Amino acid sequence: MTNDLEAIRKGKILMLAGTDLAGTDLAGADLAGADLSQANLSGANLAGANLQRAVLRANLRGADLSGADLRGADFRNADLRGVSFANALVRDASFGGAFLTGAALGNLDLSGVDFRGADLRGASLGRAILLGADLSNANLSGADLSGADLEEALLNGAVLRGANLTGANLLCASIEQTVWDGALLDRACLQGTPLSL
């Protein structure tokens, strides 16, 4: 397996669908465009890895993606609970239907990211840049979005029950049928938003 791991790290093996890589050290690996759908990457170390445009519809529970390049990656329906995203490049990735409960995504540039139908309950998105992000039908109950930039974001049908949006920028965000029960909106910019609480 050692030779295979070295080939994987160097990007020589990119068809990894269904592979069990739980707990594997793939830090700094070049997996751009790799197919890791249905793979088990729980607890894997992917810190600093190049995962641009990779298909990661997989179990990544507890994995380390800190500093990884995730631009354009496909995480649809993935299990990302307990994943570290610190300093990761995440623009234009797709997290539709993914499990991101309690995820730490604060201070990241999440512009253009697709979070449609994602489970972001209790997630930390404070000071994140979510310009034009699609959070339609996402569950953000109890999430921290304080100081987040949600300009022109799509929040249609999203659940923000008890979420903290203190100081958030919602300029021209789309908020049809959004659930706001108990959400904190102190000092939030709602200009250009047809907010009807």
Protein language model regions, located:
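Tandem repeat scaffolds
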Residues: M1-L197
